[in-house]
């Protein structure tokens, strides 16, 4: 049996409303992930305890995760790609299997042309081929289509500044 994904799987749903304080905390941490709660509190004019409590709630609600983001190319991973997977039957077992692999950094079940979409980060093209062959060998996989990344043009992690207006609370 494969290990379960690090975070729980679930449908894409609308989480609780975020207010201006939540948004300010998210934006501060996106700018400087190591910013202290005291400094954030001073910037936005609230108590440090409030920042600490709001941060804990944002993390518990899986809205916020502060982590070090690396550049795979800088770490020696020279082959990245997206793999579209079609399955016979339920896509969940296939997605769960792949989500347990270290090469898979993003796995989603989708509606549309593919049942599962997987982003892979591999050492080189030979390794990417080995991993795509492992995907093809999973029970229930009918077909795959691999999209090899040629050049990274944009990768951002600043969604906090883009909270949809209808999601904001007063």
Show the residue positions of the predicted features.
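A compositional/biophysical signature of low hydrophobicity enriched in polar/charged and small residues
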Residues: 1-170
């Amino acid at each position: 049996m494969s290990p379960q994904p690090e975070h729980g799987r679930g449908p894409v749903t609308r989480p609780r409303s975020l207010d201006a304080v939540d948004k300010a905390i998210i934006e501060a941490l996106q700018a400087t992930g190591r910013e202290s709660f005291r400094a954030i509190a001073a910037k936005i004019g609230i108590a440090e305890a409030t920042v600490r409590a709001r941060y804990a709630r944002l993390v518990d609600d899986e809205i916020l995760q502060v982590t070090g983001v690396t550049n795979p190319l800088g770490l020696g991973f020279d082959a990245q790609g997206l793999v579209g997977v079609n399955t016979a039957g339920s896509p969940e077992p296939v997605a769960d299997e792949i989500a347990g692999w270290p090469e898979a950094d993003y796995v989603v079940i989708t509606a549309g042309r593919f049942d599962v979409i997987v982003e892979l980060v591999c050492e080189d093209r030979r390794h990417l081929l080995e991993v795509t062959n492992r995907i093809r060998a999973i029970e229930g996989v009918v077909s795959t289509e691999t999209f090899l990344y040629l050049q990274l043009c944009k990768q951002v992690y600043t969604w906090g500044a883009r909270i949809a207006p209808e999601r904001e609370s007063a």
